[in-house]
Amino acid sequence: TGVEYGDYTINFVQGCSHGCKYPCYAFSLKKRFGQVKKYEDWLKPYLVSNTLELLDKEIPRFKDKIESVQLCFTTDPFMYGYPEVERMAIDSIKKLNAAGIKCTTLTKGILPQELAQCSSDNEYGITLISLDEDYREMMEPGAAPYAERLAALKGLHDQGCKTWVSVEPYPTPNLIQQDLMELLESIGFVDKIIFGRT
């Protein structure tokens, strides 16, 4: 992948229901390569139904090269309000872990507490760019409320899981006036924080 989150990735959903108002690189990429035409189409996600079968084929081919797998780079593995996406994410993680492969997740959804039963090498993250719900409703209307994301992350942390937060794209002051220290204090329990900007 060439990014810090993981050397391999799995994208088992096409599209994303979060409806983020800031530029979405995943949508831009899919549009550029003709896989989706309009943002409205992107907002209607669908599952790659043969994901587990594909993993059965791909894991033996790449197992010796893989250090970790990121779920997901072009969508959300725990898309808010989509239990079938959550189930596929958990099943994929379990299959990868059974092959000795570490997984890293990043979501604007709610991390299921069932993840605490998976490999202790896994890392579970949320995107958190503010604590202001009005701002979330404006900029990430289909994503989980911030408090729910934080509570799920804290729940996994309290069960001994490795946790992290991506604070990106961090909104500039012309978009919202907020106290960065308050945001950082709310995530002080995590193992790692990554910053980005709009």
What name fits each language-model region?
Residues 1-68:
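N-terminal [4Fe-4S]-dependent radical SAM core
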Residues 51-198:
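Conserved AdoMet/S-adenosylmethionine-binding subsite of the radical SAM
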